[in-house]
Amino acid sequence: MSLAADNVLLVEEGRPATAEHPSAGPVYRCKYAKDGLLDLPTDIDSPWQFFSEAVKKYPNEQMLGQRVTTDSKVGPYTWITYKEAHDAAIRIGSAIRSRGVDPGHCCGIYGANCPEWIIAMEACMSQGITYVPLYDSLGVNAVEFIINHAEVSLVFVQEKTVSSILSCQKGCSSNLKTIVSFGEVSSTQKEEAKNQCVSLFSWNEFSLMGNLDEANLPRKRKTDICTIMYTSGTTGEPKGVILNNAAISVQVLSIDKMLEVTDRSCDTSDVFFSYLPLAHCYDQVMEIYFLSRGSSVGYWRGDIRYLMDDVQALKPTVFCGVPRVYDKLYAGIMQKISASGLIRKKLFDFAYNYKLGNMRKGFSQEEASPRLDRLMFDKIKEALGGRAHMLLSGAAPLPRHVEEFLRIIPASNLSQGYGLTESCGGSFTTLAGVFSMVGTVGVPMPTVEARLVSVPEMGYDAFSADVPRGEICLRGNSMFSGYHKRQDLTDQVLIDGWFHTGDIGEWQEDGSMKIIDRKKNIFKLSQGEYVAVENLENTYSRCPLIAQIWVYGNSFESFLVGVVVPDRKAIEDWAKLNYQSPNDFESLCQNLKAQKYFLDELNSTAKQYQLKGFEMLKAIHLEPNPFDIERDLITPTFKLKRPQLLQHYKGIVDQLYSEAKRSMA
């Protein structure tokens, strides 16, 4: 299959298999890198320059905003300017140096998204200090591991996390010497810190220890380590991904380039809503980009219950989400439309299908149905504050029906991407005006080249004349330098200059990439059938009755079972219709008739999407508690942690197999 030359360019022919290596397909890059991969200009050496230049251009523009709660009442967004944030970063950076942290040393940042997080990051950048984000959800053991592994001597922490960091001080006392709270600290905490031989400061105290002298800021180099980002992963200890100044800086330029060609470059009129974890590469690089353009960044309160309330208060122009959030947005809007009456529902369906048809013919978002946008869809856009002109999605593939909906309804451009911490965030992105890319993650970003490598054991052939499939491999200017202190792990994934992602992709004729599988998320049933479990979960998730699902099988069993978190309203509606006593949610999940109903509906969905017989579920457990980070069942980007899920539900899984075998006997 030849790929569309108007979207991607062939860089290098493929290579056949050898005794040591499987075959590898051709190398491609996107059309916006036709003269070579995007690289840094000679006058840019670090991300700090983006911020310092923005301060000169936009000193009085609103930069960082948050809502303050007083007497249980939340207020409007309050802002600090670029100049105020810059001065704070210079003072904090100076104070860090006064504690003996020198350029090249590591400084930790541990807490939820807030202005202080970004100021601490910029403070480190100003001094050439490597900042190490600590996930609020990693847990004390992982935090202790990272502090010791990265040799962090100073850490910034959220006010409510001070006690947590003090509790692990005993295990990292040889490294950690200074703790700085984003807010206040109590006298009791000060005393506890003193007893553990660590200095503890409030944000204001620490700021006063620094000065505003910019004359002696150290020189930065492109090859200096900017950050070490520890990925939570789904197994084992966290891995420290090394990203240097050049990788992050060129990724910022890459984002600007792709926004320019798919929508528009951002400017001082733009407002970005920050709620995805700042410790994760995706949101962090996006914020660095917006702050390079003089835009504003507003932070959520950190409570999922009030997420949409914060969106309404901020009215962002760019919304960066993950499939889980967009799924809920889609379900909420569709529920309101269904409840609006038959006539309104039919009018909506007509308008939706008319615009969908025009966009499939090649009309742009703006051209497809301007009158229907004003009459039908502009009101729906209010769900995201009414001003969003760009929606971005990452972390996992969007379900096709949700992606189509988001491209049509909010009258905003939607770009879905794919990337990893190792690729400094996005490595592929869809082109907003190319509707054929729905269901894919788009073309390579202008900083990277991509190829597929065959995976014979899974039946994926990167040389297939029909549809090339294989493991996605990347190389380029925004890639990581390796794993901190783990050359063994680096050598496993960096082979001949190519980073092996572990994700299985499929080239499309328009030059876009479709994620179809995960190399590690495949297992064989006892009769020899291979099961691509992530694909199955994505299919079963199309069933409107469920909120989350984990499918399990192994090579000793001939069939699959699952743990399902049901949609609460769906199971309560079923109870009313079937004269079952509603009781409480937990009791309904234990109801045998409810379990049978949900299993039948899931397998009906499986048949609808033509799953094979061995891919059908034979038994399920209805779980009232969502899979969450607190129990270590999902990652901060909502990916299932399969070993931990099996450990948590081992007894239930064994019971499901026993009961299913008895019923089949």
From Swiss-Prot:
| InterPro entries to which the protein is assigned, alphabetical | AMP-binding_CS, AMP-dep_synth/lig_dom, ANL_N_sf, LC-FACS_euk
Q: Which cofactors are reported in the record for this sequence?
A: Mg(2+)
Q: Where in the cell is it found?
A: Endoplasmic reticulum
What induces or represses its expression, per the UniProt entry? Positively regulated by WIN1.
Reactions this protein catalyses: a long-chain fatty acid + ATP + CoA = a long-chain fatty acyl-CoA + AMP + diphosphate
According to its UniProt record, in which pathway does this protein act?
Lipid metabolism; fatty acid metabolism
- CDD domains to which the protein is assigned, alphabetical: LC-FACS_euk
A Pfam family cross-referenced in the UniProt record is AMP-binding
Q: Which SUPFAM superfamilies match?
A: Acetyl-CoA synthetase-like
Region (Fatty acid-binding), start-end ranges: 496-520
Q: What are the EC numbers?
A: 6.2.1.3
Q: Which family does it belong to?
A: Belongs to the ATP-dependent AMP-binding enzyme family.
- Function text: Activation of long-chain fatty acids for both synthesis of cellular lipids, and degradation via beta-oxidation. Acts in the cutin pathway. Preferentially uses palmitate, palmitoleate, oleate and linoleate. Required for repression of lateral root formation through its role in cutin biosynthesis and subsequent aerial tissues permeability.
Q: What is the name of this protein?
A: Long chain acyl-CoA synthetase 2
Q: What is the lineage of its organism?
A: Eukaryota, Viridiplantae, Streptophyta, Embryophyta, Tracheophyta
